[in-house]
């Protein structure tokens, strides 16, 4: 059974997950590895990776998912904010909405991913203003926590998710 690993990665986090999948799956069965592309549609099973934008997969990934029909799909992604299972499930549910009903989701995985330093700088600039949102300290703390992700534990959990 052929497979493709299709991913969109703005900061390299999702690319790291895609590379981990590529290392774990049989190389001879892989017909495509890379950014969303029609060439991947030849595969029976698609591992589709994304970065989170406004609570769902990025636009390129959502457009690609809409092209899938009768495929087995494993979704994987990263999100800079949060590390809670309910938050990740909400993102995955919003992403699954792009899939046609003829597809079968065979699994999914999400983890936190590091964000560009410009995000922290924006939070710090906001905090310097007299009237700022009250949760900026929590946002900065989350940014700092995300710096090590995806980490070795995340990659191991991904490996387990595809077994």
Regions found by a protein language model. Name each.
Residues 36-40, 64-67:
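Short, conserved, surface-exposed binding loops centered on an aromatic residue
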Residues 24-29, 45-48, 53-163:
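FMN-binding flavodoxin-like domain, especially the glycine-rich phosphate-binding loop
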């Amino acid at each position: 059974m052929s497979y493709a690993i299709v991913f969109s990665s703005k900061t390299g986090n999702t690319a790291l997950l895609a590379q981990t999948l590529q290392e774990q799956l049989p190389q001879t069965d892989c017909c495509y590895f890379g950014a969303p592309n029609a060439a991947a549609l030849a595969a029976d099973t698609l591992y589709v990776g994304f970065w989170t934008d406004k609570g769902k997969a990025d636009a390129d990934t959502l457009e690609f998912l809409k092209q899938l029909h009768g495929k087995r799909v494993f979704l994987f992604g990263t999100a800079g904010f949060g590390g809670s299972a309910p938050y990740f499930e909400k993102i995955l549910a919003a992403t699954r909405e792009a899939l046609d009903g003829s597809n079968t989701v065979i699994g999914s995985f999400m983890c936190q991913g590091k964000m560009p330093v410009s995000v922290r700088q924006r939070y710090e600039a906001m905090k310097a203003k007299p009237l700022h949102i009250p949760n900026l300290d929590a946002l900065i703390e989350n940014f700092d926590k995300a710096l090590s992700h995806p980490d070795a534990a995340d990659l191991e959990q991904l490996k387990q998710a595809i077994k």
